[in-house]
């Protein structure tokens, strides 16, 4: 016999079966989603309601701003930042490999060498293009 209660019970058991082991993850996901929403809402509700021309000016540590806020940076800053990010990400990828070096074996060692070789080629390319020169 088809019974609505038995159908809902079977559906509930199926949901519980699929979610078993993920309760902590779902709880963490819900809390980590709610905290920024609550913080932004609280800051919007508690902030002072100021209107006026001072609000549109740039803040320079309490000192009266001099000139415009638009400053054009040299492209060299971006090149250094890009090279830094590339090699910073390299260390993030190589650290777990170095920690588990003995368990991974020869194949992982060869893969890491290929990864390092590609990054060395990128460094040599950036060096030859003059991205690392400051002049």
Swiss-Prot record:
GO molecular function: NADH dehydrogenase (ubiquinone) activity; quinone binding
GO cellular component, one term: plasma membrane-derived thylakoid membrane
A single GO BP: photosynthesis, light reaction
Catalytic activity annotation: a plastoquinone + NADH + (n+1) H(+)(in) = a plastoquinol + NAD(+) + n H(+)(out); a plastoquinone + NADPH + (n+1) H(+)(in) = a plastoquinol + NADP(+) + n H(+)(out)
Similarity remark: Belongs to the complex I subunit 3 family.
Enzyme Commission number(s) of this protein: 7.1.1.-
Cited function: NDH-1 shuttles electrons from an unknown electron donor, via FMN and iron-sulfur (Fe-S) centers, to quinones in the respiratory and/or the photosynthetic chain. The immediate electron acceptor for the enzyme in this species is believed to be plastoquinone. Couples the redox reaction to proton translocation, and thus conserves the redox energy in a proton gradient. Cyanobacterial NDH-1 also plays a role in inorganic carbon-concentration.
UniProt membrane topology term: Multi-pass membrane protein
Localization annotation: Cellular thylakoid membrane
Gene3D superfamilies recorded: NADH:ubiquinone/plastoquinone oxidoreductase, chain 3
PANTHER family attached to this UniProt entry: NADH-UBIQUINONE OXIDOREDUCTASE CHAIN 3 (PTHR11058:SF9)
Protein name, per record: NAD(P)H-quinone oxidoreductase subunit 3
Phylogenetic placement of the source organism: Bacteria, Bacillati, Cyanobacteriota, Cyanophyceae, Oscillatoriophycideae
Keyword terms of this UniProt record: Membrane, NAD, NADP, Plastoquinone, Quinone, Thylakoid, Translocase, Transmembrane, Transmembrane helix, Transport
Class of enzymatic activity (EC top level): translocase
Membrane-spanning segments: 15-35, 79-99, 104-124
Keyword check for NADP: yes
Summary of subunit composition and partner proteins: NDH-1 can be composed of about 15 different subunits; different subcomplexes with different compositions have been identified which probably have different functions.
């Amino acid at each position: 016999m088809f019974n609505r209660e038995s159908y809902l019970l079977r559906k509930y058991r199926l949901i519980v079966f699929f979610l078993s082991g993920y309760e902590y993850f779902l709880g963490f996901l819900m809390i980590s989603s709610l905290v920024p929403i609550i913080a932004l809402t609280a800051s919007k509700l508690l902030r002072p309601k100021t209107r006026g021309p001072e609000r549109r000016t740039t803040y320079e540590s309490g000192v009266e701003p001099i000139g415009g806020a638009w400053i054009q940076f040299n492209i060299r800053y971006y090149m250094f930042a890009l090279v830094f990010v590339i090699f910073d990400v390299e260390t993030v990828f190589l650290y777990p490999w170095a920690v588990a070096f003995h368990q991974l074996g020869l194949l992982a060692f060869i893969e890491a060498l290929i990864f390092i070789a590609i990054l060395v080629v990128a460094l040599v390319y950036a060096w030859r293009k003059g991205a690392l020169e400051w002049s």
